[in-house]
């Protein structure tokens, strides 16, 4: 009113941080369950780079244990990626959608498969697969070959297969989706799921087959990243 100029204010806030994020190091040292993490921070000299290195080592170990419990792995290798699986354990699901909205109340890994027909004029051409967004992480395969992996629930997935692997006829896309908690699945709009080559698009939305791999229930606690707001003491300096 004083300047006679309209002013717009946007309140962009995000919640969900745990209490320990807002608590000091000295206080958490006295709280049962946090002593080990506080000792690690002290040993690292509170240096973010060293804590990140430790996190990556812990995450690698956790993933090895997690993957070892996944029904989709055998002797450490994925076993559902080379051919279309047809067992009774595989169920249909219409995608894209959070799988909770399709009746699957589950946190963990879910394997999705879809058989596609590669047109003759795509043979020998690079093919792009657009898979909307996947919550949280994924590893994607085509005819038994890994074509990409991404972390992050709100990141659009686009993977390419080289011209040398593009052959006319039937092919199988396999997606191992990993959801650590909350909503999970291949989500977005139907028009965001398609394959593309030679100036042509073919929709990938619709029915896929799925099989659960390993549940987060009973799994060891996933390591926390020191770069996230869930890390103990991370928000305390801003108080």
Name what the model sees in each region.
Residues 90, 116, 122-144, 173-175:
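Aromatic-lined ligand-binding clefts that engage carbohydrates, nucleic acids, or primary amines
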Residues 102-104:
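Outer-membrane beta-barrel proteins
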Residues 2-3:
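A short, Lys/Arg-enriched amphipathic alpha-helix followed by its capping loop at the start of a domain
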Residues 10-17, 21-98, 167-239:
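An acidic-aromatic loop/edge-strand motif
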Residues 106-110, 121-123, 132, 165-169:
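Solvent-exposed loop and beta-edge segments used for protein-protein assembly and interaction
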Residues 7-11, 130:
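Structural recognition of the beta-strand scaffold that forms the well-ordered cores
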Residues 133, 141-192:
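Beta-strand-rich ligand-recognition modules
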Residues 106-119, 157-159, 239:
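Short beta-strands within extracellular/lumenal beta-sheet-rich domains
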């Amino acid at each position: 009113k004083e300047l006679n100029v309209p002013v717009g204010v946007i309140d962009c806030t995000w919640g969900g941080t745990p209490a320990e994020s807002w608590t000091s190091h000295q206080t958490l040292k006295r709280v049962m369950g946090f002593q080990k993490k506080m000792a690690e921070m002290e040993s690292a000299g509170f240096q973010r780079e060293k804590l990140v290195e430790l996190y990556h080592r812990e995450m690698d170990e956790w993933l090895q244990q997690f993957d070892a419990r996944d029904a989709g792995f055998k002797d450490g290798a994925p076993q559902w990626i080379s051919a279309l699986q047809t067992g009774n354990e595989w169920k249909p699901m219409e995608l894209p959608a959070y799988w909770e909205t399709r009746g699957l109340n589950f946190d963990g890994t879910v394997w999705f498969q879809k058989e596609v027909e590669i047109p003759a004029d795509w043979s020998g051409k690079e093919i792009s697969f657009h898979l909307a967004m996947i919550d949280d992480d994924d590893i994607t395969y085509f005819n038994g070959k890994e074509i990409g992996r991404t972390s992050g629930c709100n990141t659009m997935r686009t993977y390419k297969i080289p011209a040398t692997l593009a052959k006319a006829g039937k092919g199988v896309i396999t997606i191992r989706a990993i959801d650590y908690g909350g909503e999970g699945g291949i989500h977005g709009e139907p028009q965001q799921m398609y394959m593309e080559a030679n100036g042509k698009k073919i929709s990938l939305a619709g029915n896929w087959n799925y099989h659960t791999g390993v549940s987060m229930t009973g799994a060891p606690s996933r390591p926390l990243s020191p770069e996230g707001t869930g890390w103990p003491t991370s928000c305390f300096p801003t108080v």
